[in-house]
């Protein structure tokens, strides 16, 4: 699993962290997308930074292909499984697409099992902010995920950049170990439906 760090107050001091896709390589202007719902501003920033970005969030709840740079992989946030259709449209137009699983239950109307079953894309666990969510992302073998600083500790601890870097290294070591559901011999004998 490859982890990403989106924009946060410490991001300038975390540019040298290895093993993560660090903002702006992972572009996720949550303020423009979620709070302001200012897609024009987001698109302008996307085009302006297109040579620095590897992966970006595709604007939520947009069911058509926007004029976005083609050199970037897009995480399409899936709030309802029918929104996988926009991922299909993007792929048909030669965009690199990753399906985004909404970690917060209030932003989706499906289970993680339904998402894994329905998605034919690489999968991204959006907004990993608890140990439970990290374990879940590893268990279900997500390809990518972005973590929030809340995963690393309390607010007072997060003021210490060295503490944050140490915790990021610990998480990277945990993620680099193999995870997922353990197969049993019975898995090989169950007849497919």
Region spans (language model):
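Donor nucleotide-activated moiety binding/catalytic core segment of transferases
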Residues: 96-125, 133-135
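A structural motif
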Residues: 51-53, 94-95, 142
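A cross-family glycoside hydrolase active-site/sugar-binding cleft signature
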Residues: 4-8, 21-26, 56-59, 75-79, ...
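Non-catalytic, usually N-terminal nucleic-acid engagement modules in DNA/RNA processing proteins
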Residues: 1-70, 119, 155-193
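Histidine/lysine/aspartate-rich catalytic loop segments that bind and position anionic ligands
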Residues: 76-107
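Catalytic cores of alpha/beta
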Residues: 84-89, 122-123, 129-144
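Short, charged, surface-exposed secondary-structure boundary motifs
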Residues: 84-90, 106-114, 134-136, 153-162
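Glycine-rich phosphate-binding active-site loops on the catalytic face of alpha/beta enzymes
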Residues: 102-105, 129, 138-168
């Amino acid at each position: 699993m490859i982890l990403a760090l989106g924009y946060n107050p410490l991001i300038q001091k975390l540019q040298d962290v290895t093993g993560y896709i660090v903002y702006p390589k992972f572009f996720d202007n949550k303020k423009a997308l979620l709070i302001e719902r200012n897609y024009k501003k987001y698109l302008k920033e996307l085009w302006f930074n297109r040579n620095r970005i590897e992966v970006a969030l595709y604007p939520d709840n947009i069911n058509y292909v926007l004029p976005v740079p083609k050199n970037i992989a897009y995480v399409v946030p899936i709030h309802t499984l029918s929104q996988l259709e926009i991922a299909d449209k993007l792929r048909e137009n030669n965009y690199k697409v990753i399906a985004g699983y909404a970690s917060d239950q209030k932003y989706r109307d499906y289970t993680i099992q339904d998402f894994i079953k329905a998605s034919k894309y690489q999968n991204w666990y959006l907004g990993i902010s608890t140990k439970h969510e990290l374990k879940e992302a590893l268990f279900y073998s997500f390809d990518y995920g972005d973590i929030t600083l809340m995963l690393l500790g309390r607010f007072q601890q997060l003021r210490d950049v060295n503490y944050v870097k140490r915790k990021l290294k610990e998480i990277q070591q945990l993620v680099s170990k193999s995870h997922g559901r353990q197969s049993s011999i019975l898995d090989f004998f169950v007849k497919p439906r």
